[in-house]
């Protein structure tokens, strides 16, 4: 991780990085603003279009924190400039997803299950959301190239796009949705990441 830590973080045009007391870092870009407190033992300096992270010692813990801090800062810069996206696919007869207000409603073969466990504002669709949930139309699926990301047949209401500027929160939200009904190994029914390869099992045969 120390090798990664030594690499400067390139700050693209339109993005600003500010470092305050206690290593509270604010990164602003065209997609929004992120603020996080990074490990205080590291020193973060901004010089022109680069941000550099340095460590106080070569101790094992500092080397580890060095790479981690640099990676977190890089994720923030990418988030506000390019954003992050996770695409999930629903497989199963009668299964579907419906965007209703701030909630994503999943019909997965049993009771209606609104995704919960996270602040409601993360489901609000706005110009600069932290996390945005989408159920794209067929035209949007083709425009975004989602139909080319898998060999499975895809259609609207069977695709969920989780989009946002915070890499960790996008991944966590996608995991929450997938966890509502993970793909089962016999028929592959359930919610999976679109690039996920589900290992199938052969069911028992009658004698």
Can you say where each PLM-predicted feature lies in the sequence?
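N-terminal intrinsically disordered, cationic/polar leader segments
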Residues: 2-66, 70-78, 82-207
């Amino acid at each position: 991780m120390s090798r990664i830590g030594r690499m400067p973080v390139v700050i693209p045009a339109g993005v600003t990085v500010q470092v305050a007391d206690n290593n509270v870092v604010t990164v602003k870009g065209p997609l929004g603003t992120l603020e996080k407190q990074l490990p205080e033992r590291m020193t973060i300096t901004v010089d022109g279009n680069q941000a550099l992270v340095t460590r106080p010692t070569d101790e094992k813990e500092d080397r580890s924190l060095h790479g981690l801090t640099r990676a977190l800062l890089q994720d923030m810069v990418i988030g506000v400039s390019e954003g992050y996206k996770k695409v999930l696919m629903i497989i199963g007869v009668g299964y579907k997803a419906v965007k209703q207000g701030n909630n994503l409603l999943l019909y997965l073969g049993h009771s209606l299950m609104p995704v919960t466990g996270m602040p409601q504002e993360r489901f609000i669709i706005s110009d600069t959301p932290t996390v945005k949930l989408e159920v794209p139309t067929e035209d949007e699926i083709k425009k975004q190239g989602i139909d080319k990301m898998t060999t499975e047949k895809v259609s609207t209401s069977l695709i969920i796009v989780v989009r946002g500027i915070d890499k960790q929160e996008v991944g966590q939200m996608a995991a929450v949705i997938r966890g509502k009904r993970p793909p089962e190994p016999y028929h592959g029914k359930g919610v999976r990441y679109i690039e996920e390869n589900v290992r199938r099992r052969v069911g028992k045969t009658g004698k």
